[in-house]
């Protein structure tokens, strides 16, 4: 059984007398910065000139510097920028300010795994990746709880990188819930696969296809929305709480029987073969190469697909229904 590590396994004092620079102040950035600050750490924020996040960080009681200045001042640098921006910012602002003994850290391994960022040998390179969005990481911390996190060591120059990564995870509240050790390769590949095959790509297409099937058969679009999108959260919440078994214990016998006899008609060996192809594209770098090239061209395909998907009927129907949900206001 894989081991989880908790508060008693991590030594927060390892971060004492270290200045931690959080690069970026978006969803994860604000959560990391404020949780570390509330844990008693010396935290600063690095942002590009004119960033809309600057006033928010200042109002949250944090000192804000340019990325270059923050990295120069810091002992620990946590890069919390979108994947496609990290390489350029690293080369221009971060790398020139790296010195022996500094710690370079990430919350996702994409740029290290695919060789876009190649740190010098004299710094520690670690990862601390909360398994939840930033607002949840912050909310749970404020309520005395935490969000589970992954941690990994890519490069141990100091000989103490693992303990330092665990200390950081404790500082943001991860060890309250439990942290799991992994490596950059495993985290990156499984994270990308989960997003593409199940959580985002797979689920989005499943929801849309179900909605389309009902509407094309003459059913009310509003009912199709409820059955194929709205109720997804109800089922997923049961899965998260107690796995597939508890979900099935909580639904009707009719629903459970339909689960068993119809599920594999949709998700079958052919589906699994496509999943394996998706995983292979991730493992061999094909997806990363395509994504980097897409970003270098200013994302023309992604922009086109985003616009097309935003016009799907399920979006129009959902917007209308949600405006009538008093509990969402």
Curated annotation (Swiss-Prot):
Which molecular function term from Gene Ontology is one that the record holds?
NADP binding
Write out the entry's keywords from A to Z: Amino-acid biosynthesis, Branched-chain amino acid biosynthesis, Magnesium, Metal-binding, NADP, Oxidoreductase
Give GO cellular component annotations, separated by semicolons.
cytosol
Q: Which positions does UniProt annotate for NADP(+) binding?
A: 25-28, 51, 53, 83-86, 134
Q: Which residues form the KARI N-terminal Rossmann domain?
A: 2-182
InterPro entries from the entry? 6-PGluconate_DH-like_C_sf, KARI, KARI_C, KARI_N, KARI_prok, NAD(P)-bd_dom_sf
One GO biological process from the UniProt record? L-valine biosynthetic process
* Chain sites annotated for binding Mg(2+) 1: 191, 195
Q: In this protein, which residues make up the domain named KARI C-terminal knotted?
A: 183-328
Does the keyword field hold Magnesium?
yes
* EC identifiers of the protein: 1.1.1.86
Q: Where does substrate bind?
A: 252
UniProt key word Ion transport: no
Q: Which cofactor does it need?
A: Mg(2+)
Entries under Gene3D superfamilies matching the protein: 6.10.240.10, NAD(P)-binding Rossmann-like Domain
The metabolic or biological pathway listed in the UniProt record of this protein is: Amino-acid biosynthesis; L-isoleucine biosynthesis; L-isoleucine from 2-oxobutanoate: step 2/4; Amino-acid biosynthesis; L-valine biosynthesis; L-valine from pyruvate: step 2/4
Q: Which chemical reaction does it catalyze?
A: (2R)-2,3-dihydroxy-3-methylbutanoate + NADP(+) = (2S)-2-acetolactate + NADPH + H(+); (2R,3R)-2,3-dihydroxy-3-methylpentanoate + NADP(+) = (S)-2-ethyl-2-hydroxy-3-oxobutanoate + NADPH + H(+)
Query: According to the record, how does the cofactor bind?
Result: Binds 2 magnesium ions per subunit.
**Organism's domain of life?**
Bacteria
Which sites bind Mg(2+) 2? Answer: 191, 227, 231
Q: Where along the chain is the active site annotated?
A: 108
What does it do? Involved in the biosynthesis of branched-chain amino acids (BCAA). Catalyzes an alkyl-migration followed by a ketol-acid reduction of (S)-2-acetolactate (S2AL) to yield (R)-2,3-dihydroxy-isovalerate. In the isomerase reaction, S2AL is rearranged via a Mg-dependent methyl migration to produce 3-hydroxy-3-methyl-2-ketobutyrate (HMKB). In the reductase reaction, this 2-ketoacid undergoes a metal-dependent reduction by NADPH to yield (R)-2,3-dihydroxy-isovalerate.
PANTHER family, per the entry: KETOL-ACID REDUCTOISOMERASE, MITOCHONDRIAL
**Sequence similarity:** Belongs to the ketol-acid reductoisomerase family.
Name this protein carries in UniProt: Ketol-acid reductoisomerase (NADP(+))
**Species annotation:** Prochlorococcus marinus (strain AS9601)
